[in-house]
């Protein structure tokens, strides 16, 4: 009898795996604020999803062809590994791999890069919404007030008309997440936020996609998964076949597919990206055979867009900030000469996938390029970010006429090293800044922003441990002269900006400081943050009526283009 019990127990272990709890990855949350009732929930640290008591779910393991089966029990997620097989139906979107538990109907989707969610239905690369945002499936989660959106699966939304537990939630973009959506075809994406003891709906601060200078403004964002435009020609000029063409009966993606409407397929020949490819495409009849080609659809302008989070902590010289508020900010490090490791050198600005702008004076010691390293997506100067991207430097270019005495022509370019034609991948934490038009002239005293990891004040012994932002105003050229800067040389390649607040305590005026060099001075233009200056030099930090001096970017657009051509 004992032997039989042991055998049965061993069999259970082999089939199901050992059950365990992981309190470090799951959070026991007690939602007890205002009118909300006491609820026990579990938060899955791997997927960042929340579950109610007795809910169960699957999550993929990093190793092997197995997944974990988990359930919420008393605020803790209990999990064990289970064997899986390929799903009988293709439940996953965007090329996700479907795995079904061997002894149940539960399944899990292993998503390709750039997608997430239970069914890989969330496009992590989408940075803005088109039209009303009904098809928006990005990851923006901040309301216009700055409040964080509530999870659509929250128990407090059970009686709301739109929640993640609706039968058609997936089709509406709702689910176990807190990302902005527009399920009711309102004027723009929105979400629920908790205010004054109750959940209310509020429009999101998600940026609208800019119209490109095309005849019809038709463009795609990310990889074009949500593209629902009307373009119907490929890059070679071929006309697309209708998705219900008789020639496509043997193809996977057609107007007859069960989820065709959700994929944008139908009785038309408009370009689409139903399989999560690199960009919109279509079927074409070419050279007497059926094939497919990428479409001639331009990509929407996404530079200068951000998920701005209102700073919560005021410090000397500025405000602590999150990298998603300044996703073009780069941190440049250099190898130590006499000891292992590397040290922070300067700030930088991402202007394209493989190019970073900075200040020439940062590289006066002519470091070998392989001694430099560029970090993108980092909120804390010395702590890796969740979506951080790291690059070695292939080469850097200092302006030939840089004057190390006056800091005239204080501009440099760093070329990031990559094995492919692209380097930085766009995300909420990493994005390019818009370069200005050569004719850009902003009004005097326009409020702009700068960011960096520099010192809080000139007497500080250390650089800031966290990214900071500062709000300054553009000085008129008549106030940006040697006379106003203690006879220091000021050239036409420079501009001035500073904190113009008056009265009260002036010891906390916003300004750049040592360590911020090479970072961005950006201003809003046509709903996009646009690079106006590069942090160059100043007389002290945060002194009343003494502006900081910046490299005037409009004077170097030709130089930038000439040096970044392939």
Curated annotation (Swiss-Prot):
Cystine connections: 42-72, 70-79, 87-98, 92-109, 111-120, 128-209, 149-191, 180-204, 219-300, 240-282, 271-295, 303-434, 346-362, 354-423, 448-523, 480-496, 513-541
GO biological process: plasminogen activation; platelet-derived growth factor receptor signaling pathway; prevention of polyspermy; proteolysis; smooth muscle cell migration
Gene expressing this chain: PLAT
Site label Important for single-chain activity, positions: 468, 516
Regulation: Inhibited by SERPINA5. Inhibited by SERPINE1.
Full protein name: Tissue-type plasminogen activator
Glycosylation sites: 153, 487
Annotated catalytic residues: 361 (charge relay system), 410 (charge relay system), 517 (charge relay system)
Species name: Bos taurus
Note from the entry: Binds to the kringle structure of the fibrin A chain. Binding to fibrin enhances its catalytic activity.
């Amino acid at each position: 009898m004992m032997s039989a019990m042991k055998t049965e127990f061993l069999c259970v272990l082999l089939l199901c795996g050992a059950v365990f709890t992981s309190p470090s990855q799951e959070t026991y949350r007690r939602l007890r604020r205002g009118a909300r009732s006491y609820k026990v929930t579990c938060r899955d640290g791997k997927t960042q999803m929340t579950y109610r008591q007795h809910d169960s779910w699957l999550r993929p393991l990093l190793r092997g062809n197995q997944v974990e089966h988990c359930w919420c029990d008393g605020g803790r997620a209990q999990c064990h590994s289970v064997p899986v097989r390929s799903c009988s139906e293709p439940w996953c979107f965007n090329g996700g791999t479907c795995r079904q538990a061997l002894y149940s109907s539960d399944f899990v989707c292993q998503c390709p890069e750039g997608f997430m969610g239970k069914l890989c239905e969330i496009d992590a690369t989408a940075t803005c919404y088109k039209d009303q945002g009904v098809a928006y499936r990005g990851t923006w989660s901040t309301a216009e007030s700055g409040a964080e959106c509530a999870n659509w699966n929250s128990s407090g939304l059970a009686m709301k008309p739109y929640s993640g537990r609706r039968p058609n939630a997936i089709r509406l973009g709702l689910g176990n997440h807190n990302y902005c959506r527009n399920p009711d075809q309102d004027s723009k994406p929105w979400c629920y936020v908790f205010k004054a003891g109750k959940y209310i709906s509020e429009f999101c601060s998600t940026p609208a996609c800019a119209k490109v200078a095309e005849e019809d403004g038709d463009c795609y964002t990310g990889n074009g998964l949500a593209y629902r435009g009307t373009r119907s020609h490929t890059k070679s000029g071929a006309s697309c076949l209708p998705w219900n063409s008789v020639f496509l009966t043997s193809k996977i993606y057609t107007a007859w597919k069960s989820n065709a409407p959700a994929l944008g397929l139908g009785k038309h020949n408009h370009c689409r990206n139903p399989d999560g490819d690199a960009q919109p495409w279509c079927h074409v009849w070419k050279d007497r055979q059926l094939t497919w080609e990428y479409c001639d659809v331009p990509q929407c302008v996404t530079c200068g867009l951000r998920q701005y989070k209102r700073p919560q902590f005021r410090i000397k010289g500025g405000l602590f900030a999150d990298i998603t508020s300044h996703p073009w900010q780069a941190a440049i490090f250099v190898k130590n000469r006499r000891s292992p490791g590397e040290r922070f050198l300067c700030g930088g600005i991402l202007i394209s996938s493989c190019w970073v702008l900075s200040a020439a004076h940062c590289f006066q010691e002519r470091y070998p390029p392989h001694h430099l390293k560029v970090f993108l997506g980092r909120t804390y100067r010395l702590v890796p970010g969740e979506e951080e991207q790291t690059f070695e430097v292939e080469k850097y270019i200092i302006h030939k006429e840089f004057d190390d005495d006056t800091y005239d022509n204080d501009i440099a370019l760093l070329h990031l090293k990559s094995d492919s034609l692209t380097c930085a991948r766009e995300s909420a934490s990493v994005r390019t800044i818009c370069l200005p038009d050569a004719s850009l002239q902003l009004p005097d005293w326009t409020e702009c922003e700068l960011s960096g990891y520099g010192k809080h004040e000139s007497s500080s012994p250390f650089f800031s441990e966290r990214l900071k932002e500062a709000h300054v105003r553009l000085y008129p050229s008549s106030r940006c002269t040697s006379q106003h800067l203690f006879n220091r040389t000021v050239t036409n390649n420079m501009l001035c900006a500073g904190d113009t607040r008056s009265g009260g305590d002036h010891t906390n005026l916003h300004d750049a400081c040592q360590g911020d060099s090479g970072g961005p001075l950006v201003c809003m233009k046509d709903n996009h943050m646009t690079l106006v200056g590069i942090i160059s030099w100043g007389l002290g930090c945060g002194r009343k009526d003494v502006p900081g001096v910046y490299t005037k970017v409009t004077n170097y657009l030709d130089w930038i283009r000439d040096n970044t051509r392939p």
